[in-house]
């Protein structure tokens, strides 16, 4: 460590003589690959003062040195001494010379349509069930594979934008799939013709997108600029930019955007203000949000099966709050320890009652909640913090991982009635395993080995025998068309 300190001291001195800010050089060396040039974000989030408003400098220093749960952010304590960490923190909280801008004009100018939808045939060009296709995101080399879910054979593979968000969304008929990249690009892909229809850059640092249940609108939530961007779902042309700010005008980033199909609305969590938005679209463009006050910032949320209630939580690990969406009333507070990942939670019926289970990204537990009284039923102890959870209506098990723990090569199968761990799978010992998705009929479960020399592993969902293994480059997620457009029990929405 003394040698590291000496080397960094010499480096910082040389940079000071050259007139370059030490923190800027350290950022380029250690941070830029993930967080982007100019701190505008890449596979990691934007690192500008406004995006760090909820993080105190001392907390940022702790993250730099020791990493952050639930992310790919590793600590740099072995590479940076105290002076270097302080210099880097000072740089991150310093405003850039020019405020980053991405206007409506920039969005419109970025739109391209290589294969307009009206010019493409309306029937699939392949012999496979279009509702049992899987869209597989391979983050290792930024590609997407379209997989036949009956034969488990690739139909197509194409390059994607850099650092896709893991959850693509689909048109109601399953023909079109919409991708969002962390650097703001939205891609519209025709699964019938295996072609990119259109692309547009909706922002500089994007969280995710949602598609309306009538197939008319795409809503994109951005960290930078802090706004919502409404697009026409047919060609990604810009409809409207909606600034994210509370009723008092306090600006915010957008945490998440989801569709609530029975409500015919989008629901939006705001990261920096105590508001939740609902934007109805049944009678026109969803541009006028209904503002619901919330007790805490919402970083993550999930719906009840009937979409009447929303269960939300903050990264500050203060438990969960339940919001009744019609009235905006807070109907319950749930004591959830650690950092539950509600967006990956799933629900099922147990003894005739709906229950909700969520993994936890800071503790090795699965929290199970009774959705009739909002009381915790059980904390299932696992071998480490996890990220994903999946099931199927015809599966007796909830499949989850210990993605962020020491036993990150394990997949746990939890009996949905006894709430006990029934089986453990290790598809590739020593390599990270995570993210399960079922075929449309629930017969097979596909899981990812998250490695550049990784694989998509197909299991018989009942016998738990391995059926097939397809080599892939870090398949971070796979999404079954039929399950997604049907908002199937056991999958993410």
Swiss-Prot record:
The record lists the catalysed reaction(s) as: dihydro-heme d1 + A = heme d1 + AH2
Where does this protein hold heme d1?
165, 167, 169, 182, 207-208, 341, 390, 435
Instruction: Report the gene knockout effect.
Output: The mutant exhibits decreased dissimilatory nitrite reductase (NIR) activity. In the absence of this gene, the formation of the acrylic double bond of heme d1 does not take place and dihydro-heme d1 is inserted into the nitrite reductase NirS.
Spell out the PROSITE patterns in the cross-references: CYTC
Residue span, Cytochrome c domain:
19-96
> Which parts of the sequence bind heme c?
31, 34-35, 68, 73, 182
One GO MF term attached to the UniProt entry: electron transfer activity
Q: In which pathway does it act?
A: Porphyrin-containing compound metabolism
What EC number is given for this enzyme? Answer: 1.3.-.-
- SUPFAM superfamilies recorded for this chain? C-terminal (heme d1) domain of cytochrome cd1-nitrite reductase, Cytochrome c
> What does the UniProt record say this protein does?
Involved in heme d1 biosynthesis. Catalyzes the introduction of a double bond into the propionate side chain of pyrrole ring D of dihydro-heme d1, therefore converting dihydro-heme d1 to heme d1.
Protein family per UniProt: Belongs to the cytochrome c family.
Q: What is this protein called?
A: Dihydro-heme d1 dehydrogenase
């Amino acid at each position: 460590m003394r040698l590291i300190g000496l080397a960094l001291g010499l480096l910082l001195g040389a940079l000071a003589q050259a007139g370059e800010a030490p923190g800027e050089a350290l950022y380029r060396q250690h941070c830029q690959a993930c967080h982007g040039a100019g701190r505008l974000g890449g596979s990691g989030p934007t690192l500008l003062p406004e995006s760090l408003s909820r993080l105190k400098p001392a907390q940022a220093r702790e993250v730099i040195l020791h990493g952050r749960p639930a992310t790919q952010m590793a600590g740099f304590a072995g590479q940076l001494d105290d002076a270097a960490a302080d210099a880097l923190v000072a740089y991150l909280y310093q405003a850039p010379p020019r405020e980053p801008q991405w206007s409506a004009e920039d969005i419109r100018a970025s739109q391209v349509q290589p294969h307009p939808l009206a010019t493409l045939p309306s029937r699939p060009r392949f012999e496979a069930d279009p509702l049992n296709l899987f869209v597989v995101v391979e983050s290792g080399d930024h590609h997407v594979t379209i997989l036949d879910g009956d034969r488990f054979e690739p139909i197509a593979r194409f390059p994607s934008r850099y650092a896709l968000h893991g959850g693509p969304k689909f048109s109601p008929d399953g023909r079109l799939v919409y991708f969002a990249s962390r650097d703001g690009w939205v891609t519209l892909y025709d699964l019938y013709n295996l072609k990119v229809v259109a692309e547009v850059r909706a922002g500089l640092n994007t969280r995710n997108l949602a598609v309306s249940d009538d197939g008319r609108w795409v809503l994109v939530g951005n960290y930078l600029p802090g706004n919502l961007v409404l697009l026409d779902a047919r060609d990604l042309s810009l409809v409207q930019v909606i600034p994210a700010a509370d009723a008092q005008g306090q600006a915010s980033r957008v945490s998440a955007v989801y569709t609530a199909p029975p409500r015919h609305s989008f629901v939006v969590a705001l990261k920096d203000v105590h508001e939740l938005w609902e934007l109805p679209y049944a009678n026109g463009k969803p541009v006028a949000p209904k503002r619901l006050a919330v007790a805490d910032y919402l970083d993550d949320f999930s719906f009840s099966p009937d979409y009447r209630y929303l269960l939300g939580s903050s990264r500050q690990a203060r438990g969960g709050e339940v919001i009744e969406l019609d009235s905006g009333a807070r109907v319950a507070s749930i004591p959830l320890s650690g950092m539950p990942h509600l967006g990956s939670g799933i629900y099922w019926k147990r003894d005739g009652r709906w229950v909700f289970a969520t993994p936890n990204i800071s503790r090795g537990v699965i929290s199970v909640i009774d959705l009739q009284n909002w009381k915790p039923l059980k904390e299932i102890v696992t071998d480490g913090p996890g990220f994903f959870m999946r099931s199927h209506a015809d599966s007796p098990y909830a499949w989850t991982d210990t993605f962020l723990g020491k036993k990150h090569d394990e997949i746990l199968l939890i009996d949905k009635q006894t709430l006990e761990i029934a089986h453990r799978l290790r598809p590739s010992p020593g390599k990270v395993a995570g993210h399960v998705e079922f075929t449309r009929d629930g017969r097979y479960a596909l899981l990812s080995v998250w490695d550049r020399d990784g694989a998509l592993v197909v299991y018989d969902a009942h016998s738990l025998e391995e059926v097939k293994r397809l080599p892939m480059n870090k398949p971070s997620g796979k999404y079954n068309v039929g399950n997604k457009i049907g908002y199937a029990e056991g999958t993410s929405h």
